[in-house]
Swiss-Prot record:
Stated regulation of activity: Inhibited by fructose 1,6-bisphosphate (FBP).
Annotated protein name in UniProt: Glycerol kinase
GO annotation, biological process: glycerol catabolic process; glycerol metabolic process; glycerol-3-phosphate metabolic process
Organism: Pasteurella multocida (strain Pm70)
Keywords: ATP-binding, Glycerol metabolism, Kinase, Nucleotide-binding, Transferase
Amino acid sequence: MTDKKYIIALDQGTTSSRAVLLDHDANIVEIAQREFTQIYPQAGWVEHNPMEIWATQSSTLNEVVAKAGITADQIAAIGITNQRETTIVWEKETGKPIYNAIVWQCRRTTEITDKLKADGHEDYIRQTTGLVVDPYFSGTKIKWILDNVEGAREQAERGELLFGTVDTWLVWKLTQGRAHVTDYTNASRTMLFNIHTLQWDDNMLAILGIPRAMLPEVRNSSEIYGQTNIGGKGGVRIPVAGMAGDQQAALYGHLCVNAGQAKNTYGTGCFMLMHTGDNAVQSQNGLLTTIACNAKGEPAYALEGSIFMGGASIQWLRDELKIVHDSYDSEYFATRVPDCNGVYVVPAFTGLGAPYWDPYARGAIFGLSRGANRNHIVRATLESIAYQTRDVLEAMQSDSGQTLQALRVDGGATENNFLMQFQADILATKVERPKVKEVTALGAAYLAGLATGFWKDLSELRDKASIEKTFVPDGDEAKRTRRYKGWKKAVKRALEWEKEEE
């Protein structure tokens, strides 16, 4: 039966490009994945080669079709999700990038952000874009390229250069330069976008000296942006029809489309997003206000908090302390003891993110006594991930006035049943782990499938989305309060560790 149709999600991540093929029941049929080079020209700088991003992404697209043994005319649509903030500038005529992609992790624009703060722009940026002033976001990266690549500024003034985040670059390449577009979620990460008027902000463009002609058109996350030919000229034309930044795509993949719904992605770091509906909540607790999708893939709002050390703290146990062989061991050691024996690990190896925002905090282990052993330290490290998640969730609930009914989870560390149960206990909230683990790709596929009528609406998808396991919190309120109080005490002592004392 060859009339069976599929959706492909292109998931362009920080270390690899993937293509995920889904059928009409939202099951994953096939995955193709290719890694690409991380370029570190100097300390704190991170780049990717945009042509290599395209080469790996386009080859996984062809590969996933070949592996599944289907033909191109069986593909109903392509959706895209991408590493956010990463910045590419290329020539309109030739399609040639004028510099490597500057990756979201890259800190080279710290001097530019320091100057923005010194010039008093912080409040305006927070109110207008919903973001904090940080090298993380695209705006200062574009300015750096225009200031540092020979002739770039002049070319930009003449309208010869285009800017895009990775989604924009992929659509431009897929449509052979016919579409220069981005979606609201990706635009909201540039520090150039007014999240209230949903327009590029002329004032921010003036502050950073970026010509408006470089910028892509901003569209909904679920609509047809253009067609791509699979198999070269004369090949089958397939609509490119859905697009969202990775964290927003994951939120959508969890079907969190209403105010008060939230998800946490447990990767190297953790990203927590809470949907706030039509309300752009200004955080009083150092969270970001960002654009997410409503049920139809149109712009809505979310609060976002990031935790720097999630799974990375387990890697530290494995690679530096060498007390576990692999991250799967951590659950085994943690469950050999009934509790942490008073031990707390604060994994502030690179400072602390939301809601503390203290770059001077450093990692520490507190509460050690003679009876403390390897199991206690492993368990305390796992627990630190759950405590940090509670820190962010409390900030979100206080900002939004919403109380969470259940937390949806995804990412590598969610396989750890001990961590998920402890997370539920410490939040006093149900934790729901979905059956399909690739929720980011799922989100991009849903957006593309809804735009092309492959699925008629979100309620059809709700019937297909199944929760593999729900972790229910234990009722011990006194224990929960006591443990969390201990965590707060430990964090307090780790703050400002690196600050020079007078």
